[in-house]
């Protein structure tokens, strides 16, 4: 009996030891996995590092590329496109002007009434329409006839107060957000289509000419006074309300910048010197690339798998289209190598672009004690349930690394423009105020990103100079800005003067 009791005790003790060993082993494996997750995070953080010295190198490289792009066509990764906009709004414009904004599968028609000096925008209204899929791959005539018909409907429904005097044409600013080789303020050749459009017979044609023919067919008596892209429109919209605006930056799905340059500093410009002596340059800065950019393995993989490998590198590090995707790629590696989401890698995490930047922003801004928003997003988007608080904190840290790098690089880009304009150092006679007009959903809605960008530029400029550089949100440049450029380039300006 005693032997049996002793034997049972020995077996019981052995079982307890075995269970304890399993628990210890499990904890060790869990600890090892977490250590691996943290190692991946710290490595990523280091590779994404943007100390001030590096950002100043990026800014210097941006300035060098700007000079090269202004010197000759194809001389730089930056196209530095001449926009033929040499006459920006002053705030004195008066009258009713229109805008057509074609940037994707939807287009808008706007009417803006300007009140003249100190009058501002008295009235504005718009109509929006979707482009049927068959017209996106049809003929030029079919597409522009459809647009002109909607424009005619918009004009026909307006009240008597917007009627033009006899013999006077309505004037339109046309925002066309596809690749165009601009040949004047109101003409430009379509180079190619993007965003799901493929209309072969329009390529090589003057986009304003195609619209003008369609308007004539539909009985719309309207003249296109300005052909612009959304960044130039943002600059114009900002200039209308703040005379010190000299730079515009869009940070949304994509990114771009435009600024006011002295014509004498544009060697590739062979036309007459405009009265203003200035010209707006569309940088197409999303295509900027430099050895100083802190690229990681995730950036290289994203670029390789993209539709345009080797192009738009700056955009792929800073804009809303890509930030969420970079985060997804890092989370995928953490899941594969550290198993923080379980033994199996969540299938959804393997889907490119499933994690959008607005969702990343929502997680980054989660201030709840249990980080509930992070948990909900992981569950709803990636189908990852029951995440620990520690895991959610890791996700927020990764969000912060991705957003901080993007925002600080965007700030370095702005510094590069200011350096090219000679506004990065105090001038004789005191500081010159420079307003940077900003637009785009990323800038507007991703608060952490916006604050980081603005604070970084202040750091780079120093306390004294930072007071002279101001960011202003210029909303809807692609619409209102185009109407304002129609006003500032009106054929009737000389009559008024």
From Swiss-Prot:
Its EC number is 2.7.1.1. GO terms for biological process: glucose 6-phosphate metabolic process; glucose metabolic process; glycolytic process; intracellular glucose homeostasis. The chain crosses the membrane at residues 4-24. Residues 35-487 form the Hexokinase domain. The keyword Transmembrane helix applies. It is a single-pass membrane protein. Keywords: ATP-binding, Chloroplast, Glycolysis, Kinase, Membrane, Nucleotide-binding, Plastid, Plastid outer membrane, Transferase, Transmembrane, Transmembrane helix. ADP binds at residues 104-106, 253, 441. It catalyses: a D-hexose + ATP = a D-hexose 6-phosphate + ADP + H(+); D-fructose + ATP = D-fructose 6-phosphate + ADP + H(+); D-glucose + ATP = D-glucose 6-phosphate + ADP + H(+). Residues 229-476 are annotated as: Hexokinase large subdomain. Pathway: Carbohydrate metabolism; hexose metabolism; Carbohydrate degradation; glycolysis; D-glyceraldehyde 3-phosphate and glycerone phosphate from D-glucose: step 1/4. It is an enzyme of class 2 (transferase). GO terms for cellular component: chloroplast outer membrane; cytosol; mitochondrion. SUPFAM superfamilies: Actin-like ATPase domain. Residues 90-228 are annotated as: Hexokinase small subdomain. GO terms for molecular function: ATP binding; D-glucose binding; fructokinase activity; glucokinase activity. D-glucose binds at residues 194-195, 229-230, 256, 284, 315. Its main location: plastid. The keyword Membrane applies. It is found in: Plastid, Chloroplast outer membrane. InterPro entries: ATPase_NBD, Hexokinase, Hexokinase_BS, Hexokinase_C, Hexokinase_N. PANTHER family: HEXOKINASE (PTHR19443), HEXOKINASE-1 (PTHR19443:SF85). Fructose and glucose phosphorylating enzyme. Belongs to the hexokinase family. This is Hexokinase-1. It comes from Nicotiana tabacum.
